From Swiss-Prot:
Subunit-level organization: Interacts with BZR1, BZR2, BZR3 and GSK2.
GO CC aspect terms: cytosol; nucleus
Cystine residue pairs: none
Any coiled-coil regions, as ranges: none
The species this protein was found in: Oryza sativa subsp. japonica
UniProt xrefs under InterPro entries: ARM-like, ARM-type_fold, Armadillo, RING-Ubox_PUB, U-box_domain_protein, Ubox_domain, Znf_RING/FYVE/PHD
Function field: E3 ubiquitin-protein ligase that functions as a negative regulator of brassinosteroid (BR) signaling. Targets BZR1, a positive regulator of BR signaling pathway, and promotes its degradation via the ubiquitin-26S proteasome pathway.
Catalyzed reactions: S-ubiquitinyl-[E2 ubiquitin-conjugating enzyme]-L-cysteine + [acceptor protein]-L-lysine = [E2 ubiquitin-conjugating enzyme]-L-cysteine + N(6)-ubiquitinyl-[acceptor protein]-L-lysine
Protein name (Swiss-Prot/TrEMBL): U-box domain-containing protein 24
ARM repeats: 133-172, 175-214, 217-258, 260-299, 300-339, 341-385, 396-435, 441-481, 486-525
Outcome of mutating residue 20 to Y: Loss of E3 ubiquitin-protein ligase activity
Pathway the protein takes part in: Protein modification; protein ubiquitination
Amino acid sequence: MAGEGVEMSEEEGAFEAFVCPLTKQVMRDPVTIETGQTFEREAILKWFRECRDNGRRPTCPLTQRELRDTEVSPSVALRSVIHEWRARNEEKDLDRACASLVGGFAGHAGDEEEEESALRALVHVSQICQRSAASKDLVRRRGVLRAVAEMLKSGSRRLRLKSLQVLRVLVEDNDDNKEELGKGDTIRTIIKFLSNEHVQERELAVSLLHELSGHEPTCERIGAVYGAILLLVGMGSSKSESAVAVDKAESTLRNLDRFDANVKQMADNGRLQPLLTRLLRGEPDTRVAMADYLGELALANDDKAAVAEQAGPLLVGMLRTGATPAKEATLKALREISSSEASAKLLLQRAGVLPPLVNDVLFSTGHLPMKLKELAATILANLVASGADFRSIPLDDDEDDDGGGGGRGRRRTLLSEDVVHSQLHLISNTGPAIGCRLLSVLAGLTSSRATVADVVAAVKSSGATISLIQFIEAAHRDIRVESLKLLRNLAPYMGAELADALGGSLSSLLRAISSDGGGVTEEQAAAVGLLGDLPEGDSSLTRQLFDLGAFRALAPKLAELRRGTIRGGNRYVTPLTEGVVKVMYRVTCALEEDAEYVEFAREAGLAPLFVELLHTNGMDTVQLYSAMALEKLSLQSSHLTAIPAPPSPPAGFGCACLGRRPAAAAVPAGVCRVHGGFCSLRETFCLAQADGGKAVERLVACLDHLDGRVVEAALAALSTLVCDGVDAREGVVVLGEADGLRPVVDIMVESRTEALQRRAVWAVERILRVEEIAGEVAADQTVASALVEAYRNGDPRTRQTAERALRHLDRIPNFSAAFQSKRS
């Protein structure tokens, strides 16, 4: 029989009785009418409808005889004969196609005749199997299914495409064929098509996989192929694939998620919902398994938040009521979920994770494995790192009564004294893993101004300072780092206690700072940060550090950091630099106490180094402490300068005003005009000397800094050039030469902070002592207004200074000398 335009060469001829007179085709459902003639049912019914539509009585198409009725009778015998005839022909067609596919084609591209023959055979197989479901079993038994599967490896795209189409027909509604196709590497071959560049191959492959995934054993094999689920997930979420391909991929994934192993793979590849569905709706054992696997995943932050929102309450419930295995699986999941800020806050605020975590696990008096406490400590550290307000999160379900007859007691929180005491106790009496995480918890709580005071009070009341300091020398690096971070956070609030207790641990700190592991480490940054935050006025600690060689070791390290020769390539370079600058600033605070410190500052070249550090853009703390150190150093210049014989009086005097620079007074060669002796930046710390590396210019540049603290420190350093004990008039000249007068005046006018206003008013008053400047400034109403404002609203000292400045501007009249002397 000719099937859909495909010729069959050896077809058994059809009898005339098999052919419908109307369609001229072999009948499938023959029926007989009143005249005894036989037609295809659909064809004769159509003829009757046309007769009625044309207003004619129904007639026989062959005899044209009018019919009394249009009843038709099935011709059962004829239909049976036709069916047998058709089956014989289809079997012959199938035999020829099978023979062609199984033994006649090697699957290689290049022979067009063989390729065309194979394509015709594939078409015959497809058509026959679509007409007869029984043929699908015959195809399998004769090896055609396997032969078609092998054609998927053909070099001909046409053959590959047709093979994918035919395979889908062969396995549709036939589990035996699906089982057969699932054997060997055919599934792997089909999956490879999902990454093919050709769109049609991808669509046909995913359609075939969708059909195969309806068979449970084959579905399991699909999931077992490496990369299959990833490719399907990618196709299912693709914006470039066709809607059909996306839908088939999604449907295939839904079939695949019947197996736990596939669900885990999907979660690995970002498709979390099947796992969450099992977790939320599964049996208890399934929930535990899903929670356990959830803890093994490396989730993106968005996924962590989604899991926390959907499954957080359930996990907290499992933590409260579950047995030990369930608690462990839940804690693993919570450890992963809590490691982002958004998800941690969801767990705290919506799921209520804190009370069971702390009360039922971490501080539990039951016989829980230490592994669970370690997990709980890690989760707690993650939660604290989220920055949530732990003052408002109670650890108890209900507030306790205070025992006074109805009053309600203060809620227990993570910051309650007894809770902090319990943490400190665990830190000292458990292994390094738990201790490290709890140190991290306390370090996180003390990093917030809102909560640090509670922890400081608890540390003091527990007497745990010595214990915490001992962890600096722990064998485990992580414990050392976390303890250093905690102690550094405590230093601003209990610096004296820490300085007294450090004692022998100072050498350990210095070893940590000086260690060279090929880059800057977190431990180095934390150790030097702690030293830098201890009170700089503690002379005993300064002496200890000096005797231990701390300053001599850190000075060259600071120089290397400035030059960039220490390249950590990480986030710890900046905190290390800031910490070292703070430590080196300490020695400048003690220059008046011991000549050794002065000699060291000279040898180490601290003044030139701090001048260089003023140019460290982006490091406000470094610039701040460098300017502060230069102030301390500059104050020593008048004591260190070597005074020569008195120079000849200058021929005349001029001063740099707001817009021009006067000529400086003549001084002997090599003599500092500000300090009146032989000065240098390195030896006498003089900012005004030519070897100062533009110290004054760099300090002036800092007056425009956005950080008011840096501005104040730079102004304080510059003020040493116009203070008592130096030639202030010459200091004004130096400031003028560096274009520093206008910025000082602008600071006073802007009045950003009270401290800045006080310093600026003092400096302006000193500048206005130079008559030439006072004369010019008198015309600037903004300066006078700023001084009047300081005079009206400043503190007593600032008001006195502003009054003197206004007198320089003749804004306040000069009274009698006697009265003036009393006023001064």
